[in-house]
């Protein structure tokens, strides 16, 4: 909203009404020692024209995917967003709607959320989904807590192949709740199965995996799930929704709870947010799900309608006994997800996934032919891959930047042992010419 300062007359009226003689008297309780004595050094205000130009100059200092060709991924992905997504999002009834506190009045909003839940269930092969989470990381943390609640156990196994920042969020959520987190090492870019099997026992609530994982590799979900289930634990999978256009659904692979980052559908990079998380599970765990759930029903006249259902799980009903303290969702971002995926359809999603897979494999193959460059891990991957290089990754990225190319992520930031490794991502937005230009640029670096 606009900020309109009070006039001197208005200030006097307010002070008189509350029985105070001056602003100084109003703030008399604040000690002089903590008050700012000097005036803030704030420049004079700008006209609208001046402000637009100033903000334009400021924005021009950023390096965006509009001007640069980017091969960064690692949880935030550049995908083509059809124009129909933003056009439908701009409808005022969607744009201004928040989480429905008088839900039955907001039938349109509830239906949109219901459609989102339906799509998530179809993608993941699960029985129920919620209205969305803050992001993929918080969704994974909530799924871990669900597992502990369902099994009455206080230990989870977390492979190092899960996104490092997801693991940070897991620690933030779980450690204060007394949940033990045991990290499992990786072998050839995927979960070390032997180490996992040794760590598994009847105290483990769940094994968490990400597939495709942080390195882009496809994990052996069926094998891992069988090991977890044999000890009475659950399998929680974090997935990239685009990959599900080609890969088997987590439900088919034996997952009990599925989460993911929904940003790849309908949501631009946005400098890291806002994004949305999705969370789905098998029917037996639905009552343990966090957040809002929209259900379809019929009114007394037999007309179809939508309601918030199973609300006894939620904070506004049970307070400290709630399944989670999340009391919101990412409805607008989830709507963008829903519109984009609905427009794609099954065939469109499959084609999108195929393009991501093929272009990434072409890029990995061509870069691997360069002297001093090789694919770090052997095994199936989706649209991200790790390159081992004899040249400094920092030097490579600085050289590529001069060609208006944003290179891969330097993995030493998260994995000190991978100090000569770069994580690249290739999506459908890259042409063969783009990839060839990347390869040529890397080939020039000595």
UniProtKB/Swiss-Prot annotation:
This protein's record includes keyword Ribonucleoprotein: no
A Pfam family of this chain: GDC-P
Keyword Oxidoreductase part of the UniProt annotation: yes
Reaction(s) the record says it catalyses: N(6)-[(R)-lipoyl]-L-lysyl-[glycine-cleavage complex H protein] + glycine + H(+) = N(6)-[(R)-S(8)-aminomethyldihydrolipoyl]-L-lysyl-[glycine-cleavage complex H protein] + CO2
Paired cysteines (S-S): none
Chain segments annotated as coiled-coil in the UniProt record: none
Main enzyme class: oxidoreductase
InterPro entries named in the record: GcvPA (IPR023010), GDC-P_N (IPR049315), GDC_P (IPR020581), PyrdxlP-dep_Trfase (IPR015424), PyrdxlP-dep_Trfase_major (IPR015421), PyrdxlP-dep_Trfase_small (IPR015422)
Quaternary structure (record): The glycine cleavage system is composed of four proteins: P, T, L and H. In this organism, the P 'protein' is a heterodimer of two subunits.
Protein name according to UniProt: Probable glycine dehydrogenase (decarboxylating) subunit 1
Organism listed in the record: Desulfitobacterium hafniense (strain DSM 10664 / DCB-2)
Gene designation per UniProt: gcvPA
């Amino acid at each position: 909203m606009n900020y309109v300062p009070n006039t001197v007359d208005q200030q006097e009226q307010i002070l008189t009404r509350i029985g105070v003689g001056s602003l100084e008297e109003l703030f008399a309780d604040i000690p002089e020692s903590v008050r700012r004595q000097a005036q803030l050094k704030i420049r004079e205000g700008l006209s609208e024209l001046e402000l637009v130009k100033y903000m334009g100059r400021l924005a021009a200092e950023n390096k965006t995917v509009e001007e640069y060709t980017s091969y960064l991924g690692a949880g935030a992905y550049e995908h083509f967003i059809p124009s129909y997504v933003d056009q439908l999002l701009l409808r005022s009834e969607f744009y201004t709607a928040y989480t429905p506190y008088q839900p039955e009045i907001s039938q349109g909003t509830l239906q949109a959320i219901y459609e989102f839940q339906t799509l998530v269930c179809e993608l993941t092969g699960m029985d129920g989904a919620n209205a969305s989470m803050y992001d993929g990381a918080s969704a994974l943390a909530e799924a871990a807590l669900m597992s502990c609640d369902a099994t009455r156990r206080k230990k989870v196994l977390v492979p190092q192949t899960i996104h490092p920042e997801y693991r940070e969020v897991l620690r933030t959520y779980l450690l204060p709740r007394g949940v033990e987190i045991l990290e499992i090492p990786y072998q050839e870019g995927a979960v070390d199965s032997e180490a996992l099997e040794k760590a598994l026992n009847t105290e483990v609530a769940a094994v968490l995996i990400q597939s495709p994982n942080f390195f882009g590799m496809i994990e052996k979900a069926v094998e891992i799930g069988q090991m977890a289930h044999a000890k009475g634990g659950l399998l929680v999978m974090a997935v990239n929704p685009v990959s599900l256009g080609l890969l088997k659904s987590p439900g088919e692979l034996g997952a009990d709870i599925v989460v993911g980052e929904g940003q790849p559908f309908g949501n631009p990079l946005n400098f890291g947010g806002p994004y949305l998380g999705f969370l789905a599970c098998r029917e037996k765990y639905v009552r343990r799900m966090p957040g809002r759930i929209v259900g379809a029903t019929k009114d007394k006249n037999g007309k179809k309608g939508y309601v918030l259902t199973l609300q006894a799980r939620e904070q506004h009903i049970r307070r400290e006994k709630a399944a989670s303290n999340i009391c919101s969702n990412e409805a607008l971002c989830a709507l963008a997800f829903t519109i984009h995926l609905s427009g794609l359809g099954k065939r469109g999603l499959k084609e999108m996934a195929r393009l991501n897979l093929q272009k990434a494999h072409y890029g990995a193959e061509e870069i691997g032919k360069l002297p001093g460059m090789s694919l770090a891990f052997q095994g199936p991957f989706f649209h991200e891959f790790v390159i081992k290089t004899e040249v400094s990754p920092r030097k490579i990225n600085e050289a590529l930047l001069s060609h208006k190319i944003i290179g891969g992520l330097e993995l030493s930031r998260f994995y000190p042992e991978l100090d000569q490794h770069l994580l690249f991502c290739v999506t459908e937005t890259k042409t063969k010419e783009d990839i060839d230009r990347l390869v040529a640029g890397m080939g020039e670096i000595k």
